[in-house]
Amino acid sequence: MPELSRTAYADLFGPTTGDRVRLADTDLFVEIEEDRSGGPGRSGDEAVFGGGKVLRESMGQGRTTRAQGAPDTVITGALIIDHWGIVKADIGIRDGRITGIGKAGNPDTMDGVHPDLVIGPETEIVAGNGKIVTAGGIDTHVHFIAPGAVDEALASGVTTLIGGGTGPAEGSKATTVTPGAWHLAWMFAALESSPVNIGFLGKGSTMSKESMRDQLRAGVLGFKIHEDWGATPAVISACLDVCEESGVQLAVHSDTLNEAGFVGDTFDAVAGRTLHAFHVEGAGGGHAPDMITAVSLPNMLPASTNPTRPHTVNTVEEHLDMLMVCHHLNPAVPEDLAFAESRIRPSTIAAEDILHDMGAISIMSSDAQAMGRIGEVILRTWQTAHVMKRRRGFLPGDTRADNLRARRYVAKYTINPAVAQGIEHEVGSVETGKLADLVLWDPRFFGAKPQLVIKGGQIAYAQMGDANASIPTPQPVLPRPMYGALGTAPATNSVNFVSEQAVEDGLPERLGLGRAFVPIRSTRGRTKADMRQNDALPRVEVAADSFAVTIDGELVEPAPVTELPLAQRYFLF
């Protein structure tokens, strides 16, 4: 029987089991662990679309109708990178959800076709052969300041935005809070036509539990406590009381100035309850200089914001100006300048790199337009992974490729933020039953520029050439909105995540909007152990005088890098 070389097979059908794929211009490689769509011993029946190819009537395409269960769309032969593994498979989508991961085709002519991946005449095909698929990104730290941030997020592969704001008001420029029923109602309406899932954080900086309960009924999915509104131990404890009774999450930006207490006082106020610790390194805010010690506690779900990722020769300098703008400070006021300088510490930024690689910091987010870049969550995650690969070599368990590291880092912006906010039953991974929020990448552009962004089964964003050209590819090829981002389509492909109390109180009926309101699942009792691939609890200590950081007794030596992948090679500006 004639055989194909691995090179020829990869050219025709994409890489298969045992092949390695380089991720863009990084030093990271992934090795395919399993090929569910074909590969060695199963070649010959791969689902491939095109002239003279397999997916034609009575060949790879059968007669199964949509009413009989055929999927609406099949992504063929894609390399899935997810927290659970690195596998190649066909992916079926039906009614906006993932229905099958395996082998697609026509069981009348092919062996091993997954029963939920039977291709019929009503099935669309997306060619994933030679491409990578990841789950849509989830950003849990979004300031809703400029509407254009939604486009930037989508163009980068982020499909779920959680945070707060009402536009460029001072409160929103500094804090991720949408305060009160009136603001929440019109912000839900404003984002109705945006093809992203939305979740708003309410103001937890209050001793009024009744106000917090009102905000829950008005549609918040959780609360945010921020030092600019007040982050005292009493406020934290009161808000967590409401979180415990309602099941929602509390995200905290703690007291940088240590005015109302030190980091230990905040930990005492939390009292072992689950908490989502924002920008835990501290440059984005939080007890100076030792907020980073929160990574040692099992009840803390720690996150980074992306401007400190990874530590480069430019990181410290750019942060001072960012701080002045974001927190309404005046560089001519000595106290304001001291406030800013206390937050920017090379030692803790350097430690943040290592803690990510150890799996001790579980989540990556943006802090969009408030000391963070919404379009760089994914990019900076993989830049950090690259820097750590160069510095620390393979992770234990990795030898020929970086599968464990890839699974660890992809989890930071997909499944782990979903778990932290109680939405992992709907989004956060490439698994059956979940919303088909999927990102298709050319491996050469992985982490930088998605080829397609699929939102609830609909193509919402894509790299697309001149619309007046004779084919889709002539320059300028740019990330552009597609039909899934137009008209009323976003109301069918995206959801609003809210508290269960909001749904029970009739919020969807009161607002009368088109998209579904989906209640979160309880976040209470969740711990670091629930953070996929990122559950490490090292002992971290920070010297009060020098800010020197030790991790499990080992001193961290700052080594800012001068060059990164996924940078000027991919972007003019």
UniProtKB/Swiss-Prot annotation:
Binds 2 nickel ions per subunit. Keywords: Cytoplasm, Hydrolase, Metal-binding, Nickel. GO terms for biological process: urea catabolic process. Ni(2+) 1 binds at H141, H143, K224, D367. Its cofactor is Ni cation. The modification N6-carboxylysine is found at K224. Substrate binds at H226. Ni(2+) 2 binds at K224, H253, H279. It is found in: Cytoplasm. SUPFAM superfamilies: Composite domain of metallo-dependent hydrolases (SSF51338), Metallo-dependent hydrolases (SSF51556). Its main location: cytoplasm. It is an enzyme of class 3 (hydrolase). Pfam families: Amidohydro_1, Urease_alpha. InterPro entries: Amidohydro-rel, Metal-dep_hydrolase_composite, Metal_Hydrolase, Urease_alpha_N_dom, Urease_alpha_subunit, Urease_AS, Urease_asu, Urease_asu_c. Carboxylation allows a single lysine to coordinate two nickel ions. The active site is at H327. Residues 136-573 form the Urease domain. It catalyses: urea + 2 H2O + H(+) = hydrogencarbonate + 2 NH4(+). GO terms for molecular function: nickel cation binding; urease activity. Gene3D superfamilies: Metal-dependent hydrolases, Urease, subunit C, domain 1. Its EC number is 3.5.1.5. GO terms for cellular component: cytoplasm. May form a heterohexamer of 3 UreC (alpha) and 3 UreAB (gamma/beta) subunits. May also form a heterotrimer of UreA (gamma), UreB (beta) and UreC (alpha) subunits. Three heterotrimers associate to form the active enzyme. Belongs to the metallo-dependent hydrolases superfamily. Urease alpha subunit family. This is Urease subunit alpha 1. It comes from Streptomyces coelicolor (strain ATCC BAA-471 / A3(2) / M145). The gene is ureC1.
